[in-house]
Amino acid sequence: MKTIWFDLDGCIAGLYAVENWLDYLQNESTYPYEAAKPLLNFSMLAKLLRKLQNHGYKIGIISWTSKSGSEEYHNRVEYAKRQWLARHLPSVVWDEIRIVRYGTNKYLSCGGGILFDDEERNRDSWEDESYAPEDIIRILKSLLEEV
């Protein structure tokens, strides 16, 4: 079965809605990653993901760290993102979590599957199925109907 990959920032996590998010990142603060609100109904998302896993799908996160910053900052960003997932989706057992450097080709990092990402260039370079965040629930439900 395929892996279903989710981007975090701007896809399921509201990083860009955090006031002054860019200033925080430029000053190597992880606050926006910690303060981001969920962008969809996580109770429904968690239920759908568990059902899909029960039918053989794997689920994963593929997300970039900040565009700039020290190696230590990138490590703190990765930690903050993992903590965010644990706090907001505690019932989800992720098959993979890949937090990679900004600009990394996500398809080459993951090797395919289904991608949900807010960045059009990531969807365009994905050589398999890819969708915008607003399609998450609809697509997950349609996958369940197919199994």
Which ranges hold each PLM region?
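The start of beta-strands in P-loop NTPase/AAA+ ATPase cores
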Residues: 2-4, 112-113
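Alpha-helical substrate-recognition element adjacent to the catalytic core
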Residues: 3-5, 9-84, 88
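A short acidic, amphipathic alpha-helical/loop segment
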Residues: 44-51, 109, 125-129
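Structural alpha-beta junctions
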Residues: 55-56, 86-96, 127-133
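Lumenal/extracellular "mature" regions of secretory-pathway glycan-modifying transferases
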Residues: 76-79, 92-98
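Conserved Lys-Pro-Asp/Glu-containing loop-to-beta segment of HAD-superfamily phosphomonoesterases
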Residues: 96-121, 126
